[in-house]
Amino acid sequence: QAGNFVSPDDATFKAAAAGADWSKTFYQVLTDEPGKDAWPITGATFVLLQKTQDKPAQGAAVMKFFDWAFTNGDKAAAELDYVSLPDALKAQIRKQWAEVKDASGKTVAFK
């Protein structure tokens, strides 16, 4: 989009993810993101978590796993040729987890 020649690598994929506006929704099509270093064809993998959990212990386990992955998984992701999420996005996702409730409306805690 900026007219620069970029190579498909971790840095240009991260630049595409960093250029997305994640503030309104986590659903993003990362094609042709702005930024002089952004690779133009980048994709994201999504995990859906129900806001109302009928099995809160399982929902808590899912959040605990992703919390661990966000904290400890960047190196393993890179070794498998995946690109980790930007730190600001990880923080935004963690904040959103406060909206996950059980059937009675109580927040599902995972720590």
Range-by-range predicted roles:
Residues 1-72, 82-111:
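Flexible, solvent-exposed loop/hinge segments that line or gate ligand/substrate-binding clefts
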Residues 77-78:
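A short acidic/glycine-rich loop-to-helix N-cap element
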